Amino acid sequence: MKIIKISPRGYCYGVVDAMVIARNAALDKSLPRPIYILGMIVHNKHVTDAFEEDGIITLDGPSRLEILDQIDSGTVIFTAHGVSPEVKQRAKEKGLTTIDATCPDVTKTHDLIEAKKSEGYHVIYIGKKGHPEPEGAVGIAPDIVHLIEKADDLKTLEIPTDKILVTNQTTMSQWDVQHLMEDIKKKFPTAEFHKEICLATQVRQEAVAKQADVADLTIVVGDPKSNNSNRLAQVSQEIAGTKAYRVADVSEIQLEWLQGVEAVAVTAGASTPTPITKEVIAFLEQYDPTNPATWERKRNVPLQKILPRVKVKKQ
């Protein structure tokens, strides 16, 4: 069986930066304890489990404000997905020490919304409902930001001005965003468009579109909560025309997927640890459908191999 290692794949700079910030926080003895992450620092359970070993507590919930209500003291890390000004203000009022690990690409979108609000615009924001990134973006100016996920959401959308900005969640499918923007243009012809798909998301999606088309199957390594991982599977199926499955790690691979497969493409979401992806590739490289000894799918990557190394500062 031929293995096509799609490149680029895996970690983006925003994810690595967020994890380094959190690791440095764990090593900083001057920070008030306990240290919490407000939601998953990045959408990967292997990463949050590894941080738990570092003594950092991940709290998750339906909204950042509701999670914050669980915290009375200590240090709070804001995740790569960004948070609203209301969350930052509430943390300040509670006397919490805060560390901001927001991805710079997300901050760029927040700044754009702020600027357009001051100019009297309304904003149509294309994003996935229930995902923390749109929650933070809408929270920048909830009175003028309108979240839409699908074309159907446009049917009931009314905006009381011709000054309209259209932007989006950074990890959406670029093709979905483009189609929605075309629909928006028909309904709101005066709208201005700022496509904010981050470069890492864009090049990973384009790599799948161009490289997975010669495979019989694509395996995307990524957490079920990772929007960019789920979008990679979508791109494989809808753009490359190759059936795709998303797995959190090697243990989730089903042998029946591999029946009759001569070429399998492998990629990984931007929040997927490299050792987890390497383990999937190693399994596929040694897999022999006629030899049961090669069929075991067990995750063996130790948690201490998940997080990036950081230099310990001398006291």
Swiss-Prot record:
[4Fe-4S] cluster binds at C12, C103, C198. Keywords: 4Fe-4S, Iron, Iron-sulfur, Isoprene biosynthesis, Metal-binding, Oxidoreductase. Pathway: Isoprenoid biosynthesis; dimethylallyl diphosphate biosynthesis; dimethylallyl diphosphate from (2E)-4-hydroxy-3-methylbutenyl diphosphate: step 1/1; Isoprenoid biosynthesis; isopentenyl diphosphate biosynthesis via DXP pathway; isopentenyl diphosphate from 1-deoxy-D-xylulose 5-phosphate: step 6/6. The keyword Protein transport does not apply. Catalyzes the conversion of 1-hydroxy-2-methyl-2-(E)-butenyl 4-diphosphate (HMBPP) into a mixture of isopentenyl diphosphate (IPP) and dimethylallyl diphosphate (DMAPP). Acts in the terminal step of the DOXP/MEP pathway for isoprenoid precursor biosynthesis. HAMAP family: IspH. This is 4-hydroxy-3-methylbut-2-enyl diphosphate reductase. It comes from Bacillus cytotoxicus (strain DSM 22905 / CIP 110041 / 391-98 / NVH 391-98). The gene is ispH.
